[in-house]
Amino acid sequence: MATVMEFKATARPKSGKGAARAERRAGRVPGVIYGDNKPPLPISVEDKDLRLRIQAGRFLTTIFDVVLDGQKHRVIPRDYHLDPVKDFPVHVDFLRLGEGATIRISVPLHLKGLESAPGVKRGGTFNIVTHTVDLEAPADAIPQFIEADVSTLDIGVSLHLSDIALPKGVKSVSREDVTLVTIVPPSGFNEEAAAPGAAPAAAAAAPAAKAGAAKAPAAAAPAAKAGAAKAPAAPAAKKK
């Protein structure tokens, strides 16, 4: 479930590059609240506060109540821009969330059962195809992550998004069934040799092959004699 946190903001009476630079010199980051069929609302937030929330992780999947002049605006961050040289935030965008709103969002993928997977025990290696999953979820019930159990995967087997039970009200936005993870075989891996029971079967097949080879010439000999006996004698040549 989504956790709602408060974020204090101040209204920006002016817009434009000059006003934005003035906000940054004052230790604030310009931003905007938009969406829900309402006019954009220019704001600014404390630079230090914004940095801490970004560095804490999952910033773009966290719902906030932006407190502005005593009024709360339910929002979710949609984007933020960093200075290309000094790497500090220079702008932040918030999407206003109306009642009953649903949003599209990328959620981290967490895997469990990595060490107990049969494919790993046989020398295989996990290949994580994607680290995030694109979902559509209710704004008040955004999952912090999606968990996938890979404890039963064997070599050559893949886990897809359709194999996972998503939370109630959450669905995938991808048109295709997304491959999440596979187990790659080790170098020189022989599936038949590695299959359980392959060695006993091969051992049992060897004596049988030898016995068949020994019997083949014996069976061929009588057939050759019979062929010789049945062959008609060549007619004698007539004297002239």
Curated annotation (Swiss-Prot):
Protein name in the entry: Large ribosomal subunit protein bL25
SUPFAM superfamilies: Ribosomal protein L25-like
Record's keyword annotation contains rRNA-binding: yes
Record-level GO cellular component terms: cytosolic large ribosomal subunit
Organism of origin: Rhodopseudomonas palustris (strain HaA2)
Protein function: This is one of the proteins that binds to the 5S RNA in the ribosome where it forms part of the central protuberance.
A Pfam family reported for this protein in Swiss-Prot or TrEMBL: Ribosomal_TL5_C
Lineage: Bacteria, Pseudomonadati, Pseudomonadota, Alphaproteobacteria, Hyphomicrobiales
Region Disordered: start-end pairs: 1-24
GO biological process: translation
Family per similarity comment: Belongs to the bacterial ribosomal protein bL25 family. CTC subfamily.
Molecular functions (GO terms): 5S rRNA binding; structural constituent of ribosome
Tree of life domain: Bacteria
HAMAP family, alphabetized: Ribosomal_bL25_CTC
Alphabetical UniProt keywords: Ribonucleoprotein, Ribosomal protein, RNA-binding, rRNA-binding
Gene: rplY
InterPro entries xrefs: Rbsml_bL25/Gln-tRNA_synth_N, Ribosomal_bL25/Gln-tRNA_synth, Ribosomal_bL25_b-dom, Ribosomal_bL25_C, Ribosomal_bL25_long, Ribosomal_L25_dom, Ribosomal_uL5_bac-type
Subunit composition and interactions: Part of the 50S ribosomal subunit; part of the 5S rRNA/L5/L18/L25 subcomplex. Contacts the 5S rRNA. Binds to the 5S rRNA independently of L5 and L18.
